[in-house]
Swiss-Prot record:
Pfam families: HGTP_anticodon, tRNA-synt_2b. Consists of three domains: the N-terminal catalytic domain, the editing domain and the C-terminal anticodon-binding domain. Its EC number is 6.1.1.15. Homodimer. It comes from Prochlorococcus marinus (strain MIT 9515). This is Proline--tRNA ligase. Catalyzes the attachment of proline to tRNA(Pro) in a two-step reaction: proline is first activated by ATP to form Pro-AMP and then transferred to the acceptor end of tRNA(Pro). As ProRS can inadvertently accommodate and process non-cognate amino acids such as alanine and cysteine, to avoid such errors it has two additional distinct editing activities against alanine. One activity is designated as 'pretransfer' editing and involves the tRNA(Pro)-independent hydrolysis of activated Ala-AMP. Keywords: Aminoacyl-tRNA synthetase, ATP-binding, Cytoplasm, Ligase, Nucleotide-binding, Protein biosynthesis. GO terms for cellular component: cytosol. InterPro entries: aa-tRNA-synt_IIb, aa-tRNA-synth_II, aa-tRNA-synth_II/BPL/LPL, Anticodon-bd, Anticodon-bd_dom_sf, Pro-tRNA-ligase_IIa, Pro-tRNA-synth_IIa_bac-type, Pro-tRNA-Synthase_IIa_type1.
């Protein structure tokens, strides 16, 4: 393709102020995307080439796996989502689904995901175990009503995603296919030239028994990965489990009561009373809000040097009390406290606070749901709030109240924790960008949407389901995070918009013009993905743009064209060689093979 006639470049000289991370900056500066509004971008021709190459890699792998491509509607009737009991959670409060009403007043949502629609279709077309397993996938634009769109295509309101859904006759068949898809995902990301790590993950709003995320390691990642050096364990911070550091034994006190005037924080209590945070149990209050409008007050206890993992807590409450949990909100503002709590000593709350303080609430249930993390429950003695302003208490054990408590892991694992009693391995931490996620959904959706099949004995059973997502546009931006330098992008050759860029420095020179056309036509005839920068601009502008847009190889045609010689440059290594145009094609083929092999 020629820049002047079919592939205009829209590069920028200045870095847009809106772009916080390098990959977003380079996508804008390189002319790959154009901002239309907050979190909404146009994909320019050069970006569309990248997207198509990523999509082709995905399609090839999934088709080889026996999956069938389809295209599902983006506009979903609310009725389907209400049957799955996800409508309220996705549209109320901070829900991420754009929703609207048509002329007849019927409710619809713009799809962030397609479990409901595909399950409804499966209920109509799958009748017998003989049709199973089946897997469908699509590559399509998705929508999310992000509260704060940021980082370009990483957290946008529109994005391109591959989502797949499999249907099975048994849990065992689902598990087997899930492992098969895990291997396929590893192949896809490898063939995109990415360095990824698979980690155990939380299933979130999608649900299901098991899930795994695939992360690109990068400093700009919003997620944290906890892992062992040996590779024996890896999980995202929402899912990771570990053993906290050993607490410091509590010294003996002459009195059970500690006077702690204006000492509401753990830092203040430790400083004024010569204590360590591991000797304190902190109490954190939440309210759990459900789709049926009920609200449960949650009292949680955790060791003072640890932090509550709200994802783990959300999942625990959802599993124990109701799967229709919409939100979990920490209670620390005065307005909510005054409305729902009586004589509530914020900053001095103890684990044994009674139910009387919530009896006058008009919206909350009238008794605490009490949950303690293992780190609190395992303490032999500790300091905590006394339920009286300006006083804390020394508790000898947690056992005198633990029969009221649900004991569970609700703690954030962190760097430096041991992974188990049997191992001395410690967790390490790095940032990651999620580009893929696979789930074993089980029968969650088939039960609610009545998707059944007849087994070998003619009995009707619920389908077993899996779902499998890949962020196509996320892959493109994540690849830049892993492959760039001070001058611009350096694409993995597999997903680069072009394999090679031809740059004549002066098209007014007849020798350059003639040699340029000869090389361009030769490469095109061999089906090589080549771009010719035939703009009438200074050579320096072309060189700067070439490094910015990041095509793996460059051919510079300059004064030596009179001798049929050119300069051949590898973008990633910055290696330059002078070579005869006669040997150029052979050199490109051998060098490109090296890059394809390195990146796959």
């Amino acid at each position: 393709m020629r820049v002047t006639t079919s592939f205009p470049l829209g590069t920028l000289r200045d870095t847009p102020s809106e772009a916080e991370i390098i990959s977003h900056q380079l996508l804008l500066k390189g002319g790959y995307i154009r901002r239309v509004n907050s979190g909404i971008y146009a994909y320019m021709p050069i970006m569309l080439k990248v997207i198509e190459k990523i999509s082709n890699i995905i399609e090839k792998e999934l088709n080889n796996n026996g999956c069938s491509k389809l295209l599902l509607p983006q506009l979903h009737p609310a009725e389907l989502w209400k049957r799955s009991e996800r409508w309220e959670g996705y549209t109320a409060g901070e829900g991420i689904m754009f929703n609207l009403k048509d002329r007849q007043g019927k409710e619809f949502g713009l799809a962030p995901t397609h479990e409901e629609v595909i399950t409804n279709i499966a209920s109509e077309i799958i009748n017998s175990y003989k049709q199973l397993p089946l897997c469908f996938y699509q590559i399509q634009t998705k929508f999310r009503d992000e509260i704060r769109p940021r980082f370009g295509l990483m957290r946008s309101r529109e994005f391109i995603m591959k989502d797949g859904y499999s249907f099975h006759s048994s849990k065992e068949d689902l598990s087997s296919f899930y492992e098969k898809m895990e291997r396929s995902y590893e192949n896809i990301f490898k063939n995109c030239g990415l360095d990824t790590v698979g980690v155990d993950a939380d299933s979130g709003a999608i649900g299901g028994a098991a899930s795994k995320e695939f992360m690109v390691t990068a400093d700009a990642g919003e997620d944290y990965i906890l892992f062992t050096e040996s590779g024996s364990y890896a999980a995202n911070i929402e899912k990771a489990i570990s053993l906290p550091s050993k607490e410091i034994p509590l010294k003996s006190f002459e009195t059970e009561w500690l006077e702690t005037p204006n000492q509401k924080s753990i830092v203040d209590i430790c400083k004024e009373n010569d204590l360590d945070a591991s000797q304190i149990v902190k109490v954190v209050i939440f309210v759990a809000k459900f789709e049926n409008k009920s609200q449960l007050p949650i009292l949680t206890c955790i060791r003072g040097d640890q932090h509550i993992n709200e994802i783990k807590l959300f999942n625990l409450i959802s599993k124990k009390y109701s799967s229709n949990l919409i939100s979990l909100e920490i209670i620390e503002d005065n307005a909510t406290i005054e409305k729902n709590l009586t004589n509530f000593p914020l900053g001095y709350i103890g684990p044994d606070i009674n139910d009387e303080v919530i009896k006058n609430s008009s919206s909350w249930d009238k008794s605490w749901i009490r949950i303690a993390d293992h780190s609190a429950n395992n303490l032999s003695s500790f300091v905590s709030g006394s339920n009286k302003v300006n006083f804390h208490k020394v508790f000898q054990t947690f056992s005198f109240i633990d029969n009221q408590f649900l004991i569970s892991d609700i703690r954030n694992a962190k760097k430096g924790d041991r992974i188990s009693l049997e191992s001395n391995e410690e967790l390490k931490e790095k940032r990651g960008i999620e580009i893929g996620h696979i789930f074993q959904l089980g029968q969650k959706y088939s039960e609610k949407l009545n998707a059944k099949f007849s087994d070998k004995d003619g009995k009707l059973k619920n389908l077993w389901m899996g779902c499998y997502g890949i962020g196509v546009t996320r892959i493109a931006q994540a690849a830049i995070e892993q492959n760039h330098d001070e001058n611009g992008i350096s694409w993995p050759i597999q997903i680069s918009p072009f394999e090679i860029l031809i740059i004549p420095t002066n098209l007014k020179d007849p020798y350059q013009t003639k040699l340029t056309e000869e090389i361009y036509k030769e490469f095109e005839s061999k089906k090589i993905d080549v771009l010719l920068d035939d703009r009438d601009v200074r050579a320096g502008v072309k060189f700067k743009d070439a490094d910015l847009i990041g095509i793996p190889f460059q051919i510079i045609i300059g004064r030596d064209s009179i001798n049929k010689e050119v300069e051949f440059i590898c973008r990633s290594s910055k290696r330059k060689i002078k070579i005869s145009s006669q040997n150029l094609l052979e050199k490109f083929i051998s060098e490109s093979k090296i890059l394809y092999n390195e990146n796959s």
